[in-house]
Amino acid sequence: MLKMGVVLFTFLVLFPLATLQLDADQPAARYAENKQDLNPNERKEMMLSALRQRACCDPDWCDAGCYDGCC
């Protein structure tokens, strides 16, 4: 009887708790939600710093497909 109680407790209580914890643990979604709360100036600074990190292409290599304004 004790073994059946342990098995029932495991599947009816512990297993659902473990799956609920996995559903709530989504760091990428939380990170995106936090970034949406920034004011427009902070978002602009973040975007500008990301754009500055891109390297310009070599003018000799450049063709009509270069859209970033470096060529």
From Swiss-Prot:
Residues cleaved off as propeptide: 25-54
GO MF term list? ion channel inhibitor activity; toxin activity
Keyword set for this entry? Disulfide bond, Secreted, Signal, Toxin
Q: List the disulfide bonds.
A: C56-C66, C57-C70, C62-C71
Q: Where is the signal peptide?
A: 1-24
Presence of the UniProt keyword Disulfide bond in the record: yes
Which domain of life, per UniProt?
Eukaryota
Q: In which tissues is it expressed?
A: Expressed by the venom duct.
**Subcellular localization:** Secreted
| InterPro entries per record | Conotoxin
An example GO CC term for this entry is: extracellular region
Q: What is known of its domains?
A: The cysteine framework is III (CC-C-C-CC).
Q: Report the sequence similarity comment from the record.
A: Belongs to the conotoxin M superfamily.
- Indicate what this protein is called per its UniProt record: Conotoxin Qc3.1
